[in-house]
Swiss-Prot record:
Any Pfam family hit: Ribosomal_S21
MF annotations from Gene Ontology: structural constituent of ribosome
Organism for this UniProt entry: Paramagnetospirillum magneticum (strain ATCC 700264 / AMB-1)
Highest taxon in the source lineage: Bacteria
InterPro entries xref list: Ribosomal_bS21, Ribosomal_bS21_CS, Ribosomal_bS21_sf
Gene Ontology CC annotation, any one: ribonucleoprotein complex
Protein name as catalogued: Small ribosomal subunit protein bS21
UniProtKB keywords: Ribonucleoprotein, Ribosomal protein
GO biological process: translation
Gene: rpsU
Family: Belongs to the bacterial ribosomal protein bS21 family.
Length: 67
């Protein structure tokens, strides 16, 4: 992953790098790989995430429709 440093502005380049890494899910991946996760724990986590996403989508849909 590359970020251009313009006018020796390292702070701005770091900010851009962090934004790119966040968008691509690098931080999330690092957090998940920090410790070994058993396959059964992984399935349970993914199922819980899917349920959370479905609830969020339903909430947004109801909010748009005005219920």
């Amino acid at each position: 992953m590359q970020v251009l440093v313009r006018d020796n502005n390292v702070d701005q380049a770091l900010k851009a790098l962090k934004k790119k890494m966040q968008r691509e899910g690098v931080f999330r991946e690092m957090k998940l790989r920090r410790n070994y996760e058993k396959p059964s724990e992984r399935r349970a986590r993914e199922k819980a995430e899917a349920v959370r996403r479905a609830r969020k989508l339903e909430r947004k849909r109801l909010e748009r429709e005005g219920f």
